[in-house]
């Protein structure tokens, strides 16, 4: 994973060359007290974030370029100054449809889980663990991460996806995949800590 280091030692900008995605952390979870995350996301021409849903709310503002945004089955065109909100659990995704880079400013709740989940996902993409479409090559390894992150990938029906991912994640943990994540990706341990803190209400 390509990282630009900050004075504090954490990567302020992470890049995924497989899909032309660049994420700059404008306000990290640590800086917000874990309540929120603010990022700037830049997509290369044709770059896309596939349809998905998660427990966090995201507020999007288009800063440059043109994007085709899909929200709960509706198609929305975003241009500079346009905004859209994806509420928790609502399926959304977007694609850069311009011939130049497109940039979004995104404010998300569940800051710690969102940040560390993004960091692990991009690191795994760099390692070749995911396809450019965001699908895990090792189903058990990917399922453990998706389950811990509470990420839903469309278009599989939610009623089928959730028990399937839970079952695959349980099998993955039994087969040692979670230990692989813990060993290779320090941010995965931070993700687990954030999930446990939320579950305890602390």
Language model: regions and residue ranges:
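Short amphipathic
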Residues: 38-42
